[in-house]
UniProtKB/Swiss-Prot annotation:
This is 3,4-dihydroxy-2-butanone 4-phosphate synthase. D-ribulose 5-phosphate binds at R37, E38, D42, R150, R151, G152, H153, T154, E174. It comes from the Bacteria. GO terms for molecular function: 3,4-dihydroxy-2-butanone-4-phosphate synthase activity; magnesium ion binding; manganese ion binding. Gene3D superfamilies: DHBP synthase (3.90.870.10). SUPFAM superfamilies: YrdC/RibB (SSF55821). Pathway: Cofactor biosynthesis; riboflavin biosynthesis; 2-hydroxy-3-oxobutyl phosphate from D-ribulose 5-phosphate: step 1/1. It catalyses: D-ribulose 5-phosphate = (2S)-2-hydroxy-3-oxobutyl phosphate + formate + H(+). Belongs to the DHBP synthase family. The keyword Iron does not apply. Homodimer. NCBIfam families: ribB. Catalyzes the conversion of D-ribulose 5-phosphate to formate and 3,4-dihydroxy-2-butanone 4-phosphate.
Length: 228
């Protein structure tokens, strides 16, 4: 990845902070992974603040496979089985069965219907009966350790939500070019400028977490020493 393209966005720490600010403001964030992995840029929105307009943007500008990133706890709460028992995909992406809201939708495919499905799935009191299967929203189960356990967009999404102080559920979709090819970093940056979305990398987020959590452990150890 050509890191020099990200220089205008500041340091890795500053890029993550800009992303967190955008999430808290209800805006989207663009997250890019490594060249030796998917080498793709995803649009990410917080599930709890997601609007029909934002969903329409993802449907229009992205691959169309809109995914809802969930924690293992939420997947269990909704009793969502994994899509396959033996996951042989290269990156072991944690797809569960697809979902549709049991109430409040028509065909389930419109932007408004997909938002309804997502809001239903992340509601505090959500139960399995609130969802039908199959559907037009693709849930993804995140690694419990976030990007420190798996360098994926799914985990980056959950980490961003948690660090932003929001519910740990987010929506992502892979950004594509007009010709249907996957958007790489140069195209992602152009898109970000057009739609006022900050750009960061999964490695930025991993470094941010390591620094923050290491600092927390150090401070806690010092406090214990003082008390002792």
């Amino acid at each position: 990845m050509n890191q020099s393209l990200l220089t205008p966005y500041g340091t890795a720490f500053e890029r993550v902070e800009a992303g967190l600010t955008a999430i808290r403001e209800g805006r989207g964030v663009l997250v890019v992974d490594d060249e030796d992995r998917e080498n793709e840029g995803d649009i990410i929105f917080a599930a709890e603040t997601l609007t029909s307009e934002q969903m329409a943007l993802m449907i229009r500008e992205c691959s169309g496979i809109v995914c809802l990133c969930l924690t293992d706890e939420r997947v269990k709460q909704l009793e969502l089985p994994m899509m396959v028992e033996n996951n042989t995909s290269a990156n072991e992406t944690g797809f569960t069965v697809t979902i549709e809201a049991a109430k409040g939708v028509t065909t389930g495919v419109s932007a408004a219907d997909r938002v309804t499905t997502i809001k239903t799935a992340i509601a505090d009191g959500a139960v399995p009966a609130d969802l039908n299967h199959p559907g037009h929203v693709f849930p993804l189960k995140a690694n419990a350790d976030g990007v420190l356990g798996r360098r994926g967009h799914t985990e980056a999404t959950i980490d961003l939500m948690r660090l932003s102080g929001l519910k740990p559920y987010g929506v992502l979709c892979e950004l594509t070019n007009i010709d249907g090819t996957m958007a790489r970093l140069p195209e992602v940056i152009v898109f970000g400028k057009k739609f006022n979305m900050p750009v960061l990398t999964i490695e930025d987020l991993a470094a941010y977490r390591l620094a923050k959590e290491s600092n927390t452990v150090t401070n806690t150890t010092e406090e214990v020493a003082v008390i002792a």
